[in-house]
Amino acid sequence: MIIYEESASDYYNKNDRLLYGIIEIAESTIVTGSNIISDLENQGSQLQSIHYNLEHIDSDIQIANDKMDHVESCLPSVRKTARKSFKKISKKLFKKKLVSKNSRLDSGVQNSEIQNNSKIQNNSEIQDNFANNFLDNPPDNSRHFSEDNIEKLHNIVCVLEKQANDISNILDEQNNTLEIIHNKIISDEIAIKKITRRIKHTQS
């Protein structure tokens, strides 16, 4: 019976091929991480655009409030003049029997509401624990790996750690922006409803 004894060279090559396979997986993970960061940055641009548009809406609401202040300040004199004119016209029309005393004008104002159904989803994640654990707890036979591959894997892990940190920071920033947008939408809805009530009150 012939017993095959694995040479140091064969043992070295087998372990080095294993390490090279891990490196390939880690490199593909870096590409995935770059794509995630790119998508998040595009998402951030869209959120900033929404935020910018809401700032314009706030400005429009303020203008509407200022105009309503002016209208309401003029209402007493307008109503007084309107009553006098209406009495004169009513008398003339009554005499000519063109209208009845009970004629009435109804008007309605429809309220427009702001809705934001945009939802941002991101279920992608970077899994780099396998490489990190490998470097923190190397096997006893790690001396059989080539120094170049070990250094390459170490650099890849550093890149993955930076990507994970960048993604975490981007998500935190976008969560803050989303909260600001959410609060603005609620306050704008309340402001629009108040303006609508003021308009209805001036027309009553």
Swiss-Prot record:
<feature type="domain" description="t-SNARE coiled-coil homology 2">
    <location>
        <begin position="140"/>
        <end position="202"/>
    </location>
</feature>
<keyword id="KW-0677">Repeat</keyword>
<feature type="domain" description="t-SNARE coiled-coil homology 1">
    <location>
        <begin position="9"/>
        <end position="71"/>
    </location>
</feature>
<protein>
    <recommendedName>
        <fullName>Putative t-SNARE coiled-coil homology domain-containing protein L657</fullName>
    </recommendedName>
</protein>
<dbReference type="InterPro" id="IPR000727">
    <property type="entry name" value="T_SNARE_dom"/>
</dbReference>
<feature type="coiled-coil region">
    <location>
        <begin position="159"/>
        <end position="181"/>
    </location>
</feature>
<keyword id="KW-0175">Coiled coil</keyword>
<dbReference type="GO" id="GO:0005886">
    <property type="term" value="C:plasma membrane"/>
</dbReference>
